[in-house]
Amino acid sequence: YVKVYGAKALANLKLTAEGFAGSVTKVLSDAEKEALRTMLNIEENDIVFFVADKKKVAQSSLGALRVKLGHDLDLINKDAYEFLWVTDFPMFEYDENENRYVAAHHPFTSPNLEDVDKLLSDPAHCYSRAYDLVLNGYELLSGSIRIHDQKLQEKVFEAIGMTLEEAHEKFSWFMDAFQYGTPPHGGVGIGLERLTMILAGTDNIRDVVAFPKTASASDLMAQAPSPVDPAQLKELGIETK
């Protein structure tokens, strides 16, 4: 199951009446097993799963497995509404293909004020003023406080490897707007369909969307997509092959 999320394998450690058993018992010392037992409050017949991989892969695969087990073992109270605010998101994440840090949310999100001095020297430990509201595992709201200071915005661009010239070339309208005074601002976007889905007690968002697209992205109500006239393609400068 975890291979879908990029994990290569899933190891386990189970506490039985005779002691620890499982695929990782041979590679852990008795002291390490006891440390895990204390730290995780492991009791008899409890089982611990491990993924040894890059941090993001391990977190994604084990998080998905945890949710799956919750459903499969009927451990989730479907009549409860559990809200959770998620804050202090990482400001950046490392892109191994490009060998540089990129914005984890987007480059216009404000960093936490106490992390501003670390943007260039320690980007891995900078956190943002982004926030999500989660209900029963579904993201309902997502937003952030935005950058309203030009010097700070330039510093964030520099942290993701963008020169000042590139920033002005790609976002000239945005960078120029700072010169006229930008007030502190932020906001959220709400996932209304997800909220409706939870209230309706369904796991399929198409059940609550007024005119849902099919799996092939066609709109049955509007009968779209429809054939395009060659004159329209010519006007738009689009050539199909």
Where in the sequence are the language-model features?
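Structured aminoacyl-transfer and RNA-binding surfaces used for tRNA recognition/handling
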Residues: Y1-K241
